[in-house]
């Protein structure tokens, strides 16, 4: 029996508003526990919520960027459940009239493009955060009432790799709109995954498992891979899959049962009586649409068409708005686009990944990188020497020209000076000359290495190769 995997994702994104969705409480991350709450957040008797218009604008902006249809009439509903981090015993969410529906994004996996549908995007308030210790449980209500959008995908993904690509693309689009920073480590982007298997050709979905505790895109993929293998083994051995909620354990790299679901959750939704229905007219929609900046796909296409970048470079550079904006500023300052791309995708990304930092955390600036790239273009420094300059720039900042002068790193491009060095190296390595003339190409590499060593890496490589071949041919 051949089985097909069905995956759908539910993504919660915290909106970057200055105040909460139904109160004036601040939304700053990292504040002392329970210092950013109000009587509205905590559900005191007699208090009334007031809808934050900016949260609605942000939700519409995200929905439009995800190609959703925007509702003309929408409303809020009470989702009833009891849990310690939910002080009102209900959550204000949206049930049957979400703000956005029928959207899609396009992903690419192994060179193949695929459209993933988005069922709905709705607004809701976040719950508090529980922390469990050996002595008991603690609740921080700072997060209670934070504005969220929940983005529910269609079950269109067939592999964990597609799920990873979907999340990467979704995060990129949301970041470009500016409505959220999408930092998983701070909880401003969270994901639950639903996965089931069915025989190939069968239309009815199999019994799904819901995966939680997915703290990174990599863990989403790994959790889905494990669950895919677990369900496949169970089904092929004649077993049945129960509807379960499971969590991904980072230590064992397995999914672990949290609870078995005997039926669907009954949250007893009913319209929120303290908030009127919201009417979104065409003028409001168009005002929000006009505020949407250039999105990653459009920027990627522009890099290929106008700057002549390879599609791969354009894809990597536009994955995050921070990297793309940095690239644009560097090129606008006069640097060559392809050379800038090479440095950002190579040395810069390698440094950031190793140090677990973002561009905003380092001393490197677009102006600094641009000057360094232009020094390479002019032949003032070689790419090898540029790495020494780069290390200084990203750690301490500064002016590349001043760094080159202070460290004596100017590339030697004087032909007379280099010819003298080349002649001296050849005089001391006659065997290498013979080897090269006898067809041993590696001998030329040895000679170039000796020349670079003698000049402390400052010789102009193309000029060295030219002079070296000329001098060998004379002998």
Curated annotation (Swiss-Prot):
Transmembrane segments: none annotated. Keywords: ATP-binding, Ligase, Nucleotide-binding, Protein biosynthesis. This is Aspartyl/glutamyl-tRNA(Asn/Gln) amidotransferase subunit B. GO terms for molecular function: asparaginyl-tRNA synthase (glutamine-hydrolyzing) activity; ATP binding; glutaminyl-tRNA synthase (glutamine-hydrolyzing) activity. Disulfide bonds: none annotated. One of its GO terms (biological process) is glutaminyl-tRNAGln biosynthesis via transamidation. It comes from the Bacteria. It holds the Pfam family GatB_N. Belongs to the GatB/GatE family. GatB subfamily. It catalyses: L-glutamyl-tRNA(Gln) + L-glutamine + ATP + H2O = L-glutaminyl-tRNA(Gln) + L-glutamate + ADP + phosphate + H(+); L-aspartyl-tRNA(Asn) + L-glutamine + ATP + H2O = L-asparaginyl-tRNA(Asn) + L-glutamate + ADP + phosphate + 2 H(+). Heterotrimer of A, B and C subunits. Allows the formation of correctly charged Asn-tRNA(Asn) or Gln-tRNA(Gln) through the transamidation of misacylated Asp-tRNA(Asn) or Glu-tRNA(Gln) in organisms which lack either or both of asparaginyl-tRNA or glutaminyl-tRNA synthetases. The reaction takes place in the presence of glutamine and ATP through an activated phospho-Asp-tRNA(Asn) or phospho-Glu-tRNA(Gln). Gene3D superfamilies: 1.10.10.410, GatB domain, N-terminal subdomain (1.10.150.380). InterPro entries: Asn/Gln-tRNA_amidoTrfase_suB/E, Asn/Gln-tRNA_Trfase_suB/E_cat, Asn/Gln_amidotransferase, Asn/Gln_tRNA_amidoTrase-B-like, GatB, GatB_C_1, GatB_Yqey_C_2, Gln-tRNA_amidoTrfase_suB_CS. Its EC number is 6.3.5.-.
